[in-house]
Amino acid sequence: MTRVRFAPSPTGILHVGGVRTALFNYFLAKSTGGQFILRIEDTDQARLVPGAVDSIKESLQWLGVSWDEFVIQSERLETYKKISDELIAKGHAKSEDGAVRFITPTTGKTSWTDAVGDKEISFENKDIEDFIILKKDGYPTYHLANVVDDHFMQITHVIRGEDWIPSCPKHILLYKALSWEPPIFAHVPNVLGTDGKKLSKRRGAKAVLEYKSEGILSIACFTSPTTGI
């Protein structure tokens, strides 16, 4: 069964770029009789915005997007700690000043065939620095939480923006270290603003709910050239 997830961070508004990613995942799930999971990635506690989770839910509901499962990462800290301990025990990670750092191989390559364009993407392992997977505060970084949750939630396809391509080899290395099978990766082009740069919450992208308050029909988000859907 196809299982996909939309995994926003509650650090601000949901904009058209995020909606596009959600819709790609949602349409794949519905067209294949699969399941769509809404996963809130709230491990960056310093940047959480009050009310953001409810806003994300309301935005998706306005678009007619429903989810089969709802998960909040901050409720799964014991799982991340257990996996980080396992990586240390296997020699793939080390404790460092209260945090845990993954030890990247210094030889070989990490490659995958991306579902967008069916192209092989490859990185030299020597160019990938060791990276933090568990922070001093006990919260996982995006890299560890992403891989652990995708594995245990049996995610079959990871559809996300192409700006995540540089992170993908780190995720694949984690899968290999844990002897887990990675999902199919599909990195889609990002939605750009009029300045030619990626839309982002930090750069003032318009909230989806603003369109709702302006009386714009939700179907416009499915047919707009902005979303490319």
Protein language model regions, located:
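Active-site cores that bind ATP or allylic diphosphates and position pyrophosphate for catalysis
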Residues: 72-73, 86-201, 207-211
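Glycine-centered secondary-structure boundary/capping sites
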Residues: 62-64, 154, 179, 215, ...
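N-terminal Rossmann-like or analogous alpha/beta NTP/dinucleotide-binding catalytic cores
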Residues: 1-99, 126, 166-178
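Short acidic (Asp/Glu) and glycine-rich catalytic loops that position anionic groups and cofactors
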Residues: 63-64, 151-154, 199-204, 220-226
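Short, histidine-centered active-site or binding-site loop motifs used for metal coordination
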Residues: 6-10, 40-42, 148, 152, ...
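Short, surface-exposed, charged/polar-biased interaction segments
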Residues: 77, 81, 192-195, 217-220
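Non-catalytic terminal extensions that flank enzyme cores
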Residues: 1-13, 34, 186, 197-199, ...
